[in-house]
Amino acid sequence: LWIGRVVGGGGTAGPTVHDSMTWRVAGSLTGDFNDDWGWDVGFQRSRNEFFVGAEDTVKDRLYSALTGFGGPDCDPVTGAPGVGDCRWFNPFGSSLTGTGTVNTPELIDHIQGPYTIDANTRLTTFDGVVTGNFGALPGGPAGIAVGAQVREEETHSDYSELANQDAFMFVVGNPDFASSRNVTAAFVELLLPVSEQLDLQLAARTEDYGSGVDSTDPKLTALWRPTESFALRASVGTSFRAPSIFQAFGTQTTLEELTDPLVPGATQFLPVRTRPNLSGKTLRPETADVANLGFTYSPGDNLELGVDYWSFDYTDVIIQQNPQALLDAAVAGDAAAARQIERGPTGGLLRVNSFYDNASSLRTDGLDFSIAYTMELATGTLRLGAQATAVSTYDLADPQAGVIDGAGRRNFANFATSVPELRGNVFMNWQRDIHGVNVYVHHIDSYLDDGQPGSLRPIGSHATVDAQYNLALERFAGVTLSFGGFNLTGEDPPPVATNGGFDSKVHDPRGRLLYARASVSF
């Protein structure tokens, strides 16, 4: 058994190239039919071209070199191991010390192969909107907006030949992929000022993606202002999200940190190939029932207080099957999950094959809080405040992991993301003439790490300080200089038992970042 990098000590890091170019063209025309009615038509065309080039070890070439048949000019039929153009690859340290077979540069170059991705996406959009007033209500004129949109979405990914062959040891490979679709949409919105205190807004939107994938979603919003200092708002509606082109038709191989239940406590990076469900199962659109209820209270010109309750109830959530959940289910006896796990002759994990799937449900709700107080001082205007989000419920049904209470957990072995139950910040803004100072203290509460089977480990809370000083140059109208930093005290993210050592879905590992910026507005 040999575990390590093929070209480790003595080898240089392979070159990696990332090249991305995005361009966008947009235009619109507006006009009026009369004093009450107007129109707007628009066009947009955008394109992103993305190239990645790297090197990785080619499996067959390495295996040949380990048996003495390495090198670009070696013929394994007529040659002999280690003779002439056929060379041995020495994986041991003796290849560097001179006490063993030396790995020549030509052999190393031959073992490595190019892994490239040449991808592009294109989006073309036409839309039109007509707006106007169609009557009068006690609170003012009733308004309406009616619109339509046509979108053409295209994507294409071209991988190198070796990548198409799954020839690489680490990044494995990927098949080429190309697809497109046309989407049509229409909407209508009504603004009804029922009284001077009550506004109602009714809206509906319909989208058609073809192949029977369509949805019509209504929304009702109400704003009630019984006094000048108090406002109550509420909304209910539904939402709809169709599978993306990639989720419906694409294939991608990524490397993920997984724990084999047959080898508890040992984590490793393994290739996970996600692709369309080849069983013929159609990926359904994701739908949600959405509700919000909140208020703002502003007694006077200084204090502002706001509280909002929000709720999202998702059905047919579009997910990538969690590879860790697949592994756990396969070992527990799930025959369908076991067919998606590839193991070697000795039982070692080789690859996990996952699909984009529809989870049964996800329900989450919580509260948003905000408070701010503004003071006019002899030294300038000072504004102090705080904001926080508290997650009350995060219940999900994972196709492999079952019913999960995900609030306050890392959710390593299911489709959800990490969900700390409390996040918030306090801030101070000071402004005087051309000078301004902003200070923010960010806090993320502790939560539980469920990454190891049968155990829950606490992930510590995390607090960072950001600050910025702004100077508006009087001699140059519209020019502002900014100096500041993120995480000024250089706080490290709380440790997590992963190869990276932290939870990349929640915390930023970069430490203290300082910057200077000049901005121009005109």
Task: Please identify what each model-predicted range represents.
Residues L1-V183, S211, G237-P285, G306-D365, ...:
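Surface-exposed, low-complexity loop segments enriched in small/polar and acidic residues
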Residues W23-G27, R122-G128, T184-L190, T216-A222, ...:
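Hydrophobic, lipid-facing positions within transmembrane beta-strands of outer-membrane proteins
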Residues G31, G132-A136, V188, L192, ...:
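Residue-level signature of outer-membrane beta-barrel architecture
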Residues D32-G38, G135-G143, V194-L198, S229, ...:
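Short loop/turn motifs that connect adjacent beta-strands in outer-membrane beta-barrel proteins
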Residues V41-R47, I144-E152, A186, L202-T206, ...:
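Transmembrane beta-barrel strands of outer-membrane/channel proteins
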Residues S180, E207-T216, I371:
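Solvent-exposed loop/turn segments connecting transmembrane beta-strands
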Residues L255, G380-E474:
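C-terminal beta-barrel architecture of Gram-negative outer-membrane proteins
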Residues E304, S392-T393, V441-D449, L471-F522:
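C-terminal beta-signal and adjacent terminal beta-strands/loops
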